[in-house]
Swiss-Prot record:
<dbReference type="Pfam" id="PF03947">
    <property type="entry name" value="Ribosomal_L2_C"/>
</dbReference>
<dbReference type="GO" id="GO:0003723">
    <property type="term" value="F:RNA binding"/>
</dbReference>
<dbReference type="InterPro" id="IPR008991">
    <property type="entry name" value="Translation_prot_SH3-like_sf"/>
</dbReference>
<feature type="region of interest" description="Disordered">
    <location>
        <begin position="1"/>
        <end position="22"/>
    </location>
</feature>
<dbReference type="InterPro" id="IPR022666">
    <property type="entry name" value="Ribosomal_uL2_RNA-bd_dom"/>
</dbReference>
<keyword id="KW-0150">Chloroplast</keyword>
<dbReference type="GO" id="GO:0019843">
    <property type="term" value="F:rRNA binding"/>
</dbReference>
<dbReference type="InterPro" id="IPR022671">
    <property type="entry name" value="Ribosomal_uL2_CS"/>
</dbReference>
<comment type="similarity">
    <text>Belongs to the universal ribosomal protein uL2 family.</text>
</comment>
<dbReference type="InterPro" id="IPR014726">
    <property type="entry name" value="Ribosomal_uL2_dom3"/>
</dbReference>
<dbReference type="GO" id="GO:0009507">
    <property type="term" value="C:chloroplast"/>
</dbReference>
<dbReference type="InterPro" id="IPR002171">
    <property type="entry name" value="Ribosomal_uL2"/>
</dbReference>
<protein>
    <recommendedName>
        <fullName>Large ribosomal subunit protein uL2cz/uL2cy</fullName>
    </recommendedName>
</protein>
<dbReference type="GO" id="GO:0005762">
    <property type="term" value="C:mitochondrial large ribosomal subunit"/>
</dbReference>
<dbReference type="Pfam" id="PF00181">
    <property type="entry name" value="Ribosomal_L2"/>
</dbReference>
<keyword id="KW-0934">Plastid</keyword>
<keyword id="KW-0689">Ribosomal protein</keyword>
């Protein structure tokens, strides 16, 4: 998608970018309200996730992650903005009259045809089991459990690669660098998720960040000692510790957060980077 650069003398919007080719008028039957409870607070109102709060009200778009319209071709009608994710979404009009949203594959344009099922062509946007895909295929929206819907590689620009097949399992290299096993009966969509350059987008001002529900981030080194372990000192002082820590004194970088003895450990051949 082409990005438009604001040309304005106003400092607040200078060098901000916006995509003019993406619409934002969703279908009424494919949206519903969703209460954003807490916004970083727990049931007692205490902040448990920092730098969250506010933001514009959102309507949730019902995305078809299952792709269970078997052997029915559909046509891309619109490419729309979704406030609930970084990736764009496509409105698909199927031959039987059904309309559904899917994640926008990179390079797909209005008028393209997609289909899901077994023995379908290996082309962008088509969904089929891993057993029918050749090695080296770039895929996204990958199921972990058959029929549960895609759960892996769904963010903007995400793409995984099918690198091996042995027995009933397929080996995938995920965007994080993790190499894991998945059943060959699981569905996946061919191609890469669109909106690849979302991390290079310039919002132009702090207010645009607040509309997304993200509050300002303050460095611990500029706080007082009562507020952060990095705080205090005369002038611009270092953190005074061997390693950076969280506001509560725990290691901030490099600490593993995955649970030990998880059921899926046997399917992970190499951990993420």
């Amino acid at each position: 998608m082409a990005k438009h650069l604001y040309k304005t003398p106003i400092p607040s919007t200078r060098k901000g970018t916006v995509d003019r080719q993406v619409k934002s008028n969703p279908r009424n039957k494919l949206i519903h309200g969703r209460h954003r409870c807490g916004k970083g607070r727990n049931a007692r109102g205490i902040i448990t996730a920092r730098h969250r709060g506010g933001g514009h009200k959102r309507l949730y778009r019902k995305i078809d992650f299952r792709r269970n319209q078997k052997d029915i071709s559909g046509r891309i009608i619109t490419i729309e903005y979704d406030p609930n994710r970084n990736a764009y979404i496509c409105l698909i009009h199927y031959g039987d009259g059904e309309k559904r949203y899917i994640l926008h594959p990179r390079g797909a344009i209005i008028g393209d045809t997609i289909v899901s099922g077994t023995k379908v062509p290996i082309s962008m946007g088509n969904a089929l089991p891993l057993t029918d895909m050749p090695l080296g295929t770039a895929i996204h929206n990958i199921e972990i459990t058959r029929g549960r819907g895609g759960q892996l590689a769904r963010a903007a620009g995400a793409v995984a690669k099918l690198i091996a097949k042995e027995g009933k399992l397929a080996t995938l290299r995920l965007p994080s660098g993790e190499v894991r096993l998945v059943s060959q009966n699981c569905l996946a969509t061919v191609g890469q998720v669109g909106n690849v350059g979302v991390n290079q987008k310039s919002l132009g001002r702090a207010g645009s960040k607040c509309w997304l529900g993200k509050r300002p981030v303050v460095r611990g080194v500029v706080m007082n000692p009562v507020d952060h372990p990095h705080g205090g000192g005369e002038g611009k002082a270092p953190i005074g510790r061997k390693k950076p820590t969280t506001p509560w004194g725990y290691p901030a970088l490099g600490r593993r957060t995955r649970k030990r003895k998880k059921y899926s450990d046997s399917f992970i051949l190499r951990r993420r980077k």
